[in-house]
Amino acid sequence: MYAVIWMEVALDALADAFVQTDPPTRDLIERAVTRLNARLASDPSGLGESRPGHGRRIAFAQPCAIAFVVDEATGVVRVTHFWTY
C-alpha cells in the first residue's frame, strides 16, 4: 500500500469544485475521488497515463482529473493538481 498525500493546492481545487456545483455532481465527484484514492493507494503506477518527469502521471475519473507523482522508493503518492471537466 502507498501513502496518498493531497497537496494543499489540489485539496483547495477539490473543495472549490465541490462547493460550486449542484448536489448530483457533488455525488459524482465524491465517488470519483473515492475510486481514485483507492487506486492511488493500491496501484498508482498502473493508474492513468505517464507524463514527462520521474514518476509523474495523470488520471481521469469522470468528472474529475488529477495529476500526481509516484515515489516508488518511499511508497508515497502526492496528488499535485485536481480539476473537473
Predicted stretch roles:
Residues 1-65, 71-85:
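Basic, Lys/Arg-enriched alpha-helical interface segments
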